[in-house]
Amino acid sequence: MECGDVQALVIDNGSSISKAGFAGDDAPRAVFPSIVGRQRYRDVMVGMGQKDSYVGDEAQSKRGILNLKYPIERGIITNWDDMEKIWHHTFYNELRVAPEEHPIHLTLSPSSSKANREKMTQIMFETFSNPAMYISIQSALSLYASGLTTGIVIDSGDGVSHTVPILEGHSINHAISRLDLAGNDLTDYLGKLLSGRGYPFISIDETEIVRDIKEKLSYITLDFQNEIKIVSSALEKSYELPDGKVISIGNELFRCPEALFQPSFLGMESAGIHETTYNSIMKCDVDIRKDLYDNVVLSGGTTMFPGIADRMNKELTALAPSTMKIKIIAPPERKYSVWIGGSMLSSLSTFQQMWISKEEYDESGPSIVHRKCF
């Protein structure tokens, strides 16, 4: 089967959010939570015609009566049965397609194991009977989305952050840095800061409120030490809760994302994202460092804070040699740039020979993925 004849599907499964759609589109058609919910009181519910499990938005809306599970933790698939449910839901409920009719382009975290890559390949061919598939490292796709093939990507979603140097489309594996600090950690931290202000947010519903406050009002300051000296009331912003009550929030709004640069705020000993970026560049060949400093690409929802690009520029300038030109690229659509890069790549005519076909899989088994994709 010629993959160019039928539209490929592009699926980017994140720790919290899955993005799915059709190759060649400029945005995903479906964006939904990467969750599977099961009844807490199974015997009663199933007898009343309730389903055994729910996925995505439906699971989210029924969370009061369900136990919710995230099959992807810190960017890595840890529960394959639930992951299959998410893929099934993606094909049949969200995109309404037959998976056996479309090539599938999937994405993976840079720190996923060889075994995970093989398992993903096996499920696509054996469970969903895909005619062809391909797996890309997420950060490389973000780079393509910015029209680049060489640069360093700072990719931070809800579960994990990575700094990934890429040369001519290939990630430089020994120089990748991983930081287990991302959006969910910042949401938890903001919740603690707000509790200290006398607004305790405890339940799952309230965690969603904290996430919303973070996404709508938080920002990164250029000079944290200076900003923290300003009287908090001068920085206050108001937020209306679902019940109509209005609360005021001050320096918590920039103290929360400051943890990206100072993980010690969360009790972590790791370097901040500026230092991990610098460390990744320093692990690369001296000849390509200039190209990396000149193409620092931000990717993922946790890089959406206002002020992040200026702060990153300031911090990297302080670390890098003084002769180095530093350019931070922060595309406005970077929340979805992994998916967008996958969509662009899958629709190129030159990409059509890259797919792993069902015939190749039947001949070589799951290990074909390492030869063709990585």
From Swiss-Prot:
GO terms for molecular function: ATP binding; hydrolase activity; myosin binding; structural constituent of cytoskeleton. Belongs to the actin family. Its EC number is 3.6.4.-. It is an enzyme of class 3 (hydrolase). One of its GO terms (cellular component) is cytoplasm. It is found in: Cytoplasm, Cytoskeleton. It comes from Dictyostelium discoideum (Social amoeba). PROSITE patterns: ACTINS_1, ACTINS_2. It catalyses: ATP + H2O = ADP + phosphate + H(+). One of its GO terms (biological process) is phagocytosis. This is Actin-17.
